[in-house]
Amino acid sequence: MELVVGRVAKSHGIKGEIVVEVRTDEPEDRFAVGAVLRGHKPREQTVSTYTVEAARDHSGRLLLRLEGVSDRTAADALRGTLFVIDSAELEPSDDPDEFYDHELEGLSVRLADGTEVGTVIEVLHSAAGELLSIRRAGDQSGELLVPFVAAIVTSVSVADGVALIDPPEGLLDPDFGESADGK
């Protein structure tokens, strides 16, 4: 399975540097000098390889200089490029409570009594923490956002394809978070 570890947001300066939106927990390894990156534009099949020539932090953003990308025009041509890895390249975690996003996506979400809630469709990362985006099961339409914290997500079994949750009262209600006037 192909996983996105970064995306070229834009060029930076006139010497071919690019700004990368990091989508990995290990940017210091993935984007280290000498690292070979595989990248492609969204919805394109052709994958190109790039070697990192220089990497630095600038105002909280990752800037890269890649071999063969020596000016702003070449850097601009990379805008939107997705840097990818194969999930088989990931090191298995030694921590039983640590998961990669792709391991959680597709899990069946159930209550402790076995009642099916839905399926994890995405893991959202926010300043407040991770959220599981869950497509509701059965005839219930919509999406639920469940904080991925131990107090709510009580058990995850990737092998069994199941996450058990113990939601606080109201979290599963369709109108949770809406005001009385429906806004």
Curated annotation (Swiss-Prot):
Belongs to the RimM family. One of its GO terms (cellular component) is ribosome. Disulfide bonds: none annotated. It comes from the Bacteria. This is Ribosome maturation factor RimM. The keyword rRNA processing applies. Gene3D superfamilies: PRC-barrel domain, RimM. It holds the Pfam family PRC. The PRC barrel domain binds ribosomal protein uS19. Signal peptide: none annotated. The gene is rimM.
